[in-house]
Amino acid sequence: MVAMDQRESLRTMLAEHGHEATDERLRRFKLAVARELGPYASGLLIDDEYGAEVVEEAIRAVPPSCGVLLAVDVLDQQPGQIVEETSLDEREALPEGLAALKLLVIWRDDERRAERVEMSRRFVALAERHGVLSVLEPVVRHERREWAIVEAARELGATRPSLYKCQVPLGGAGDPDEIAGHCREIDAVLPCPWVVLSQGVDPADFPSAVEAACRGGASGMLAGRAVWTATLGADDPTQLLREVSVPRLQELAAIVDAHGRPWREKAAA
């Protein structure tokens, strides 16, 4: 699955590649990714920060084999900075044709832990009310990162989302067997299927990181930067998406097919 729900972080990345990062350029990039990568993905995660029409066009652009996931997180993020906190947009209406909703949660070992659990519960309930799947994405902020990843999975996985989206242990750069070992710890505390994200992982390390995560119990990946970062410098990313991102996505899909845990196994466990 491909993530294309980056907002101010995408604006920053485009600006770093020399572009005037207007809302229109962000919209064009998101829809180019949907159009070119959708046929090779099982899912596309997108946001409607820059207009509901972006989601509607993305739904029309991808084939039926690619489900569209909508981010319903409101991000507390200053330009050029990381996301500090999130809240849930408990919307009453959704575009037709959505497969799932997604919520980013910034996990910290602080006095707001119970508050974040409650927000996650409300998110899962929101998706259920709308008859779509729920994808929960905790990102930890803690000096003991590997401990925090497992602790967040234990705490927030208990809200039982349809799918849990998790950071790769060791930033994907460690020994594959060690990464797989950490992933088995994550798998042991989660009651639902889970996948890894690519934020914080060098794109060159991501294929081996996905394989290690799958050996540790993951069912795949939901990644953006590792797939399309190489296209950011182009005024029109279409050709690079076809020449660079499609083969990269196909490589990752082959790894998941070979090593990923079928999501139904974990869902039924």
Task: Locate each region found by the language model.
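Hydrophobic beta-strand scaffold residues
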Residues: V68, A127, S134-V135, W194
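Short strand-loop junctions, especially beta-strand C-caps/beta-turns
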Residues: L104-R108, P169, Q199
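Alpha/beta enzyme core
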Residues: E24-P39, T86-L101, R112-V124, R129-L133, ...
